[in-house]
């Protein structure tokens, strides 16, 4: 579209939600030559009157936006999702909230220590399947586990057909098996309790420190919320 001298000229485009901060959204505008990062807000009349809470944009959503030459962006519509995670709204009477969308795989991250819990794994598997994506169980801290095969066998019996990767994000052992899920155009979300090594795992995947990490207690292998 050819621009004129009118600074308020509007252009419509498709964008990806990369972060949500209350009423402000960080978006990546898809263009032919390069992508542009912008801040955006919702078109109030559309989202607060015509749509329920489930339709509010979340990380991973593709949305239709309207921009002007000043760099202002307005989110007009949330495009159909291929997968989505929901959480219950803490406000009584309000609809559940979408927290992540359009991912291909759900990495169910569990550590091979005292924190491993089969009931929790069942809940994770159910959530992953209900999201519409494919679950992959990531067993972390292989370098600290004397019998990783024990945990792998437990998962394989509990979730037949689900891929299992036993890894050490510290030594890199087993990380090559994870790479097959990270091809071009693929998106992954991580699900796991505190202290299982999600931040360390992400840093290992990225090859650099992109997330802070925290220590766990030795007596029960519990961790602090870092990711």
Enumerate the predicted regions with their spans.
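N-terminal accessory targeting/assembly segments
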Residues: 1-118
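Short coil/loop residues immediately preceding or within conserved phosphate-binding loops
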Residues: 12, 185, 208
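A generic structural signal for alpha->beta connector loops
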Residues: 72, 132, 161-163, 210
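Phosphate-binding glycine-rich loops and their immediate beta-loop-alpha structural context
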Residues: 99-104, 108-160
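Canonical P-loop GTPase G-domain recognition
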Residues: 134, 141-196
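Switch I (effector-binding) loop of TRAFAC-class P-loop GTPase G-domains
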Residues: 208-227
């Amino acid at each position: 579209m050819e621009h004129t001298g009118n600074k308020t000229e509007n252009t419509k485009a498709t964008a990806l939600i990369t972060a949500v901060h209350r009423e402000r959204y960080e978006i990546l505008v898809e263009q032919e030559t390069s992508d542009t990062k912008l801040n955006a807000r919702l078109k109030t009349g559309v989202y607060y009157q015509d749509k329920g809470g489930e339709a509010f944009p979340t990380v991973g959503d593709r949305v239709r936006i309207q921009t002007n030459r000043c760099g202002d962006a307005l989110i007009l519509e949330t495009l159909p999702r291929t997968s989505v995670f929901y959480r219950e709204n803490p406000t009584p009477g309000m609809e559940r909230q979408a927290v992540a969308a359009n991912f291909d795989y759900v990495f169910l991250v569990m550590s091979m220590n005292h924190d491993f819990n089969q009931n929790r794994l069942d809940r994770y598997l159910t959530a992953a399947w209900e999201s519409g994506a494919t679950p992959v169980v990531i067993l972390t801290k292989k370098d600290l586990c004397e019998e990783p095969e024990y945990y792998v066998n437990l998962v394989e019996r509990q979730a037949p057909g689900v891929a299992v990767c036993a890894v050490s994000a510290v030594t890199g052992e087993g990380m090559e098996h994870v790479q097959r899920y990270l091809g071009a155009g693929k998106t992954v979300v991580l699900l796991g309790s505190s202290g299982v090594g999600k931040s360390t795992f992400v840093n290992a995947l990225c090859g650099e420190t992109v997330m802070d990490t925290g220590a766990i207690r030795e007596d029960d292998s519990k961790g602090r919320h870092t990711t």
